[in-house]
């Protein structure tokens, strides 16, 4: 099988002889070729097993180290051009790794999934597993062995998540327990160049400052080469670094431009674009499905980060974040406004409740307060007579309240007497003296009063009567001849005075006694009888069999039982 020729710069190659080959033919000697693809420190030593010497030209590029074991490198000592190295199909790729202060070599073809217990690490002339290597390095307390092992100062997990390194033939052999990144970006899914193409240029990210190592690969035939390409050695897209450095169209190298121009010239651009679109869609669809089935993982974050940086979509992501932030701020402002309005309404409700309670208390106090009826205006009394003394012969009568229907002539009488503890005085007015009953003052009701009349009367007459301050009404009586008034030695039957409510009409019934006993009975009944049928408050008129009846109607008002506008009428048989 024809050999594939790999051309690399001399400064990027380190030749290291293997063990046990010192006395053999140089043509049969195996060597270690170090391709510097990742940033490492100058003068890297690997436990003395490999003699590692980086040329000055390589140290200037700050590139990474990849160990390649080949068969024979012909006549290097004889001055053959070291810029061209022939490698056959038995090439083995190795990575120098570290764990703490310990250093070892990771044999990539033995590094199969899941890798933790696979003997793929060469440490102190022994082939051990990564787990054993971490234990010997004193980092067994770390649960994640991929974080404990570093490749060029970078954690192995980070290298695997970014797609720069993966398990050997991971797409074919996977234990489903690796939990490593299994996505195919353009840089990891690149295939060998099209058959017939002599030279292709690929670029890989090499350092944080954006320096790029170019590997020129020339081959006679892909079918004869049989070389397996790995994502760590070939790439089709220039990836932006983690610092977000963008590659403008002006910064693209001429070789890269020629590469894509060649694809377009052979008519494969449409197919390449379709494949790229399909791969990206499948990649993003897988991320969405994993988000639904399980919590967000680190591998998904690495995929999205690489896609966003590769295609310059970070601005789009920032726009989405800005829109969501604006929506959240608007919602927060609306929430605060609503909360403030609700607090204001609550304060108003509290004030209304307090006002309502105060009004209710005031109304209740008013209802429970005793109602005092205003006193009606006092009416002027009919007359303010003197006390129980004998009035003068000519008392002044300014406002007569009673009208004399039938005047009579009465002989003057000048004597006074009392009966039943009721003071009685004789009123002399010209030739017509009248007996006046003066009752004691006070709010109590006076039940009885007495009048005097002649023993024998032939013609009844009516006289004017002036009631006292405490007597509501005094009725006149039928008198006989004035000559007989001197014989007033007997008292007639008493007069009953009954009170009733203020403002009601009073009826006064005066009845003259028969001529046989010569007595006159005057009854005053101003209050209605409780057992009477008349509901308007009129007094019941008492009927007696008398010769002469007198009917006196008067109107009583107020609690003092005063009577005004009294009409005295004499009725004869």
Curated annotation (Swiss-Prot):
Keywords: Acetylation, Coiled coil, Cytoplasm, DNA-binding, Metal-binding, Nucleus, Transcription, Transcription regulation, Zinc. SUPFAM superfamilies: SAND domain-like (SSF63763). The gene is GMEB1. Homodimer, and heterodimer of GMEB1 and GMEB2. GMEB1 and GMEB2 form the parvovirus initiator complex (PIF). Interacts with the glucocorticoid receptor (NR3C1) and NCOA2/TIF2. May interact with HSP27 and CREB-binding protein (CBP). Residues 82-166 form the SAND domain. This is Glucocorticoid modulatory element-binding protein 1. It holds the Pfam family SAND. One of its GO terms (molecular function) is Hsp27 protein binding. Transmembrane segments: none annotated. InterPro entries: SAND-like_dom_sf, SAND_dom. GO terms for biological process: regulation of transcription by RNA polymerase II. It comes from the Eukaryota. GO terms for cellular component: chromatin; cytoplasm; nucleoplasm; nucleus. Zn(2+) binds at residues 113, 170, 174, 178. It is found in: Nucleus; Cytoplasm. DNA binds at residues 139, 143, 146, 157. Residues 321-367 form a coiled coil. The modification N-acetylalanine is found at residue 2. The keyword Aminoacyl-tRNA synthetase does not apply. Residues 370-398 are annotated as: Disordered. The lineage of its organism: Eukaryota, Metazoa, Chordata, Craniata, Vertebrata. Trans-acting factor that binds to glucocorticoid modulatory elements (GME) present in the TAT (tyrosine aminotransferase) promoter and increases sensitivity to low concentrations of glucocorticoids. Also binds to the transferrin receptor promoter. Essential auxiliary factor for the replication of parvoviruses. Gene3D superfamilies: SAND domain-like (3.10.390.10).
